[in-house]
Design a protein with these regions (language model features):
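Terminal, low-complexity interaction segments
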Residues: 195-280
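Bacterial Sec-dependent N-terminal signal peptides
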Residues: 3-8, 13-42, 273-280
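Short glycine-rich beta-strand segments
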Residues: 38, 173-176
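Short coil-to-beta strand junction motifs in C2/discoidin
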Residues: 182-201
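Short aromatic-glycine motifs in intrinsically disordered, low-complexity regions
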Residues: 151-162, 257-260
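N-terminal targeting leaders for non-cytosolic proteins
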Residues: 28-153, 163
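Extended extracellular/luminal ectodomain segments enriched in beta-structured repeat modules
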Residues: 163-170, 241
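Short edge beta-strand/loop segments characteristic of extracellular beta-sandwich folds
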Residues: 172-174, 190-191
Length: 280
């Protein structure tokens, strides 16, 4: 039995901590995708020049982690000649605790702010462990609801671009400032959460044949118990996956489905795989 640990700096500029464990013929590698470093700079919303996801995630916006090939499958929908994000993930560093700012008309155009109790308005220190960058996910799927887009599946999806299965051991989850503001205070478009209402986030894994490998659900918000800091989320039970779809659902609804903002934030995604098996 042999165990070794190494630290690798990718040529692209992303600092990754890679651990290797060799037990007989196994060679297990583990990488934490933290969205930090030079290779990520051009994808961070502040460098793109907007706080609004639909202006950041354009057709040419395609990020990929070099060590794991983790990437986002983004979907946009055109409405009135304007392209809007329907499903996807944007890299951001915006963070704020000013709930009133996210409760006025047009606040949805600041949808890339994560909630951070320590800062009124900042682009530093909003990630897990006071890091800077994270990703904001948007979209969901409510198959029993019909509306302008019918029953289309707009669950934001993370996938491995090379098509090789890996295990996402876990990640950290937080709420966006816009989500916290509306679920806590309510506005003219969506009421605040009431007693007994809750909003959940579900991760569903898929293999190379697009078969489900399992699902894991966490409660993101309840009345008087809204996620406002980074929380660890164990996704290891999904097993080896090629993609993971995230679905945010619950809270008050109308004929169109979920009324609360369909946003959440992820950071420090731990990916594990058997390097010797993938080399075959």
């Amino acid at each position: 039995m042999k165990r070794c640990f190494l630290f690798a700096v990718l040529a692209a500029g992303i600092l990754s901590v890679v651990s290797c464990t060799k037990d007989d013929d196994n060679n297990i590698k583990s990488v934490v995708v933290d969205f930090e470093g030079n290779a990520w700079k051009k994808f961070v919303a502040i460098n793109v020049g907007s706080t609004y996801s639909s202006e950041v995630v354009t057709p040419g916006y395609k990020w990929q982690d070099e060590a794991t090939t983790l990437s986002a499958d983004n979907i946009s929908t055109e409405w009135g000649g304007v392209s809007y994000l329907s499903s996807g993930f944007a890299v951001s560093s915006y963070n704020s605790n000013d709930l009133e700012k996210f409760n006025i008309y047009g606040a949805y155009q600041r949808d890339l702010y994560v909630y951070n109790a320590e800062n009124e308005d900042a682009v530093k220190g909003g990630g897990n462990g006071r890091s800077d960058n994270f990703i904001v996910g948007y979209g969901n799927y409510e198959g029993d609801k019909s509306g302008e887009w019918g029953n289309e599946d707009f669950r934001p999806t993370l996938s491995f671009s090379d098509g090789k299965a890996r295990t996402i051991k876990g990640c950290y989850v937080n709420s966006t400032a816009y989500f916290v503001s509306i679920t806590e205070l309510g506005n003219e478009f969506a009421p605040a959460l009431k007693k007994g209402e809750k909003i959940t986030l579900t991760a569903t894994g898929y293999d190379a044949m697009r078969r489900e490998t399992g699902s894991v659900t966490m409660t993101l918000a309840e009345k008087d118990n809204i996620t406002k800091s980074w929380r660890a989320w164990d996704l290891s039970s999904l097993g080896a996956v090629v993609s993971v779809r995230f679905n945010i659902t619950g809270g008050p609804t109308d004929e169109w489905g979920m009324m609360s903002p369909k946003y959440f934030a992820l950071d420090d995604i731990t990916v594990e795989w058997d390097d010797s098996a993938q080399a075959e």
